[in-house]
Amino acid sequence: MIKLKEELFQKNHKILTYAIFFVVILLLEYCAPQVQSAKLKNGDLLFVTAKETGLSGAINNVTQKQKEASFDHIGIVEKAENHWYVLHAAPKGGSQKQELKSFLTDQSDEDQKVMIYRLKPEYQRSIPAALKKAESMLGKPYNFNYILDENSYYCSDYIERSFRKDHIFKLEPMTFIDPKTGETNTFWMEFYKKKNLKVPEGEPGCNPNGLAASDKLEKIGEL
C-alpha cells in the first residue's frame, strides 16, 4: 500500500512538473513581446543591423557612416488597436504592414539585431502625417533597382517619402564607390550589368545608414 502511494506521488509530481514547465513557457512567450514593445513609441524607427556579405554587405560597404553599427533595413512602428506593427518595404512582400513579433522573428532568424531610433521632441509632430503617408504607400512592389520611381519603393526610400512633407530626411547623391579602392564596388558593377542598367552613381537616393545619421534622430537602444 505504501509503495503504491509512493508511485502515485511520483507520477503526480512528474505531471505537476511538466504542467508548471508548460505554463512558464507560455508566460515567457506572452511576456516577451510585451517587454519589447514597452520600449516603443508610435512612430519610432527600427533599424536592422547589416550582414557582412551579399546584398546587405554590398549596401553597407558603400554607405556605412557609423563605426559602432551599420544597417541594411529600416521600418516605422505603428500602434493600432493595442497591437504593434512595422510598416516597411522589403524584398519579400514589398511595402507592407507586418506584426512586430513577426518582424522581429524574421530578423532574429537572420542573426540581425534591431535598434530603436526616435525623432527628437521638436520633430515628433511629424509622426501622424508620416504614418498616414506610409499607410497610403502599402501594397507597392519592392524597388530592386534602387533607382527612385513612383511605382515601387526600397526600404529607406519608403521611410524618406513618409516624412518628406516635413523635410525630416533628405535625398543625397548615391555612391557605389568602394572607399577602400576608390573604384565602383565590384558587386554593384555586376548587379547593374545583369539588369542592363548603368550604375546610378550620383543620382538622388537614400540608405538606412544615411537616415540613422540624421541629427533629427536619437538612438534609444536595442529592441
Task: Label the model's feature ranges.
Residues 6-19:
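N-terminal Sec-pathway targeting helices
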Residues 51-118, 142-150:
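Glycine-rich catalytic cores of cysteine/serine-nucleophile enzymes that process amide/ester linkages
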Residues 146, 150-223:
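Activation targets extended, charge/polar-rich intrinsically disordered C-terminal tails
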Residues 111-175:
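Active-site nucleophile-His-acid catalytic modules used for acyl/amide transfer and hydrolysis
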